[in-house]
């Protein structure tokens, strides 16, 4: 089956597949970057994205917000300009607006919310 590329604004998904956002250490920069490198949309989950940082227990939300730009940058580096890197943000998250602002400032290609 031939899958046609999909254009989203000025970006092209060579492979129109969106990797699902899976939280707490699954959907982070390595997986999202690898999917994007193959021409799909890799997705970083915001759910406890900074769980492995040493100060996570003291300030989990602050650490998660700090970890996101790093995760986005690393995913984009892995992708090498291919595909798209998105972030999945649950709308019930207490700091939803802060997450959206943070990932937009970090240059994410798309946001998936639900």
Model-derived segments and spans:
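Active-site entrance/lid segments in N-terminal catalytic domains of soluble metabolic enzymes
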Residues: 1-114
């Amino acid at each position: 089956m031939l899958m046609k590329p999909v254009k989203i604004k000025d970006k092209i998904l060579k492979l129109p597949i969106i990797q699902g956002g899976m939280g707490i250490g699954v959907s982070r920069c390595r997986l999202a970057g690898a999917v994007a490198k193959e021409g799909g949309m890799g997705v970083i989950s915001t759910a406890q994205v900074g769980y492995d940082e040493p100060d996570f227990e003291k300030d989990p939300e602050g650490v998660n917000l700090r970890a996101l730009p790093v995760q986005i940058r690393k995913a984009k580096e892995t992708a090498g300009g291919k595909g798209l890197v998105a972030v999945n943000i649950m709308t019930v998250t207490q700091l939803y607006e802060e997450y959206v602002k943070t990932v937009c400032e970090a240059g994410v290609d798309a946001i998936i919310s639900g």
